[in-house]
């Protein structure tokens, strides 16, 4: 329904459709996001499109000031999850092009229209549009075709103690632990230090006991360690990660066990459950404790947050 919309908004919806965006992004909100990415106000034409760096809140302000469309402050997540995420995956917008290493979900996050997309859209409503659109689409897959592709993230390997090696034995559980160390940690704990990795052929596959002691934690022989423990020096966080292939996730009972086991930690505790895929995660969804994070190995560049005010961080 486009009745009552400004012509720029109506045309932006048509552009999104022609670019191959799914129906969920062929709407007024997404059209206004596209207009804000190019700073196209009511008095401007497509040929006047620009490429400013712009965050979610400024986008919402743009909608209100220039098109009289006011969104509630709690709509920010809707903008992010149901429009801008798809724009980035489609390659029509860039995420933090000024600083790619900016942390996930930083309040300083910004977006920018992608250069080729900008040049194409400048030609909308001209005789060249159809030909240029066909050429543009032939050089890139549309979002519908590549929706499940992960976005690239800058990755910094986790550090292990000098002179130590980790041996991963074959098996689904060990493979997931390997993915946590090689895929999860570089994305979400860049520059982190591995303290413990269990179930790698030995009961104590890898254990930097001295570093853990320096953080105020001494584990007795009866304490059931999580599968992976990583220290994040930059944030002074200690991540306790359970890898789930057959046994359960960090549920309420396990949350309490780990809290007691790591009670002396001088670093803030972050609880994470890792699954190999979303179908296995779905089986355990009702058991996952609140105030934890969930990571799925087959979608490594995404993190699922269970409640609370922080996206990733310890709870006091």
Swiss-Prot record:
<dbReference type="GO" id="GO:0000287">
    <property type="term" value="F:magnesium ion binding"/>
</dbReference>
<dbReference type="InterPro" id="IPR009528">
    <property type="entry name" value="Restrct_endonuc_II_BsuBI_C"/>
</dbReference>
<dbReference type="Pfam" id="PF06616">
    <property type="entry name" value="BsuBI_PstI_RE"/>
</dbReference>
<keyword id="KW-0540">Nuclease</keyword>
<dbReference type="GO" id="GO:0009036">
    <property type="term" value="F:type II site-specific deoxyribonuclease activity"/>
</dbReference>
<comment type="subunit">
    <text>Homodimer.</text>
</comment>
<dbReference type="Pfam" id="PF17728">
    <property type="entry name" value="BsuBI_PstI_RE_N"/>
</dbReference>
<dbReference type="InterPro" id="IPR041962">
    <property type="entry name" value="BsuBI/PstI_N_sf"/>
</dbReference>
<protein>
    <recommendedName>
        <fullName>Type II restriction enzyme BsuBI</fullName>
        <ecNumber>3.1.21.4</ecNumber>
    </recommendedName>
</protein>
<keyword id="KW-0378">Hydrolase</keyword>
<dbReference type="GO" id="GO:0009307">
    <property type="term" value="P:DNA restriction-modification system"/>
</dbReference>
<dbReference type="GO" id="GO:0003677">
    <property type="term" value="F:DNA binding"/>
</dbReference>
<dbReference type="InterPro" id="IPR041454">
    <property type="entry name" value="BsuBI/PstI_N"/>
</dbReference>
<dbReference type="InterPro" id="IPR041963">
    <property type="entry name" value="BsuBI/PstI_C_sf"/>
</dbReference>
<keyword id="KW-0255">Endonuclease</keyword>
<keyword id="KW-0460">Magnesium</keyword>
<comment type="similarity">
    <text>Belongs to the BsuBI/PstI type II restriction endonuclease family.</text>
</comment>
<keyword id="KW-0680">Restriction system</keyword>
């Amino acid at each position: 329904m486009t009745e009552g919309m400004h012509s720029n908004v109506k045309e932006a919806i048509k552009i999104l459709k022609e670019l191959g965006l799914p129906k969920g992004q062929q709407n007024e909100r997404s059209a206004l996001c596209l207009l804000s990415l190019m700073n196209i106000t009511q008095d401007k034409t497509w040929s006047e499109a620009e490429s400013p760096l712009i965050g979610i809140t400024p986008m919402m302000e743009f909608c209100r000031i220039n098109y009289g469309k006011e969104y509630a402050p709690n709509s920010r997540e809707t903008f992010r999850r149901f429009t801008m995420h798809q724009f980035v995956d489609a390659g029509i917008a860039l995420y933090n092009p000024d600083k790619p290493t900016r942390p996930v979900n930083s309040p300083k996050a910004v977006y920018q229209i992608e250069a080729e997309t900008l040049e194409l859209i400048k030609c909308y409503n001209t005789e060249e549009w159809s030909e240029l659109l066909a050429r543009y689409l032939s050089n890139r897959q549309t979002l519908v075709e590549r929706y499940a592709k992960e976005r690239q993230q800058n990755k910094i390997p986790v550090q292990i103690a000098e002179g130590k090696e980790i041996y991963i034995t074959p098996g689904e559980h060990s493979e997931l632990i390997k993915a946590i160390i090689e895929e999860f940690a570089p994305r979400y704990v860049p520059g982190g230090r591995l303290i413990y990795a269990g179930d790698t052929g030995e009961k104590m596959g890898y254990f930097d006991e001295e570093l853990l002691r320096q953080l105020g934690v001494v584990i007795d022989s009866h304490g059931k360690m999580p599968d992976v423990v990583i220290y994040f020096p930059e944030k002074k966080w200690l991540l306790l990660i359970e890898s789930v292939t057959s046994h359960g996730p960090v549920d309420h009972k396990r949350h309490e066990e780990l809290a007691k086991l790591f009670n002396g930690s001088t670093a803030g505790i972050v609880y994470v459950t890792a699954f190999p895929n979303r179908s296995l995660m779905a089986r355990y969804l009702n058991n996952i404790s609140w105030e934890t994070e969930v990571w799925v190995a087959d979608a490594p560049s995404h993190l699922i947050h269970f409640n609370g005010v922080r996206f990733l961080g310890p709870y006091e």
